[in-house]
Amino acid sequence: PLTTLTCIRCSTAHITETDNAWLYSLSHQTNDDGETEWIHFTGSGYLLRTDAWSYPVLRLKRLGLSRTFRRLVVTLTRRYGVSLIHLDAGAECLPGLPTFDW
């Protein structure tokens, strides 16, 4: 069956430096039960497949990502109805969302 993914692209300025380090680490795991099936490093950011888990925000909490990052994921998935979040260093900042200078 064909699956359609809805996506939003936004700046990595919306995440903290600490969350960036966590995402980098999680996206580079090599073990079979790692997070690389739903957190992907792109070279200039990350792709998050939020439909890979029933409760992705709870999973992010268990993995140690900040409340600010989890709130961003909730906001993007609810406001824009997306299942794929592309955080990219070259993307635009979205209005009304916090940004971090790192």
Predicted regions located by residue number:
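Short, extreme N-terminal segment that most often corresponds to the first beta-strand
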Residues: 1-24, 86-89, 99-102
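Generic structural signal of hydrophobic/aromatic residues within well-ordered alpha-helices
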Residues: 23, 56-60, 69-73
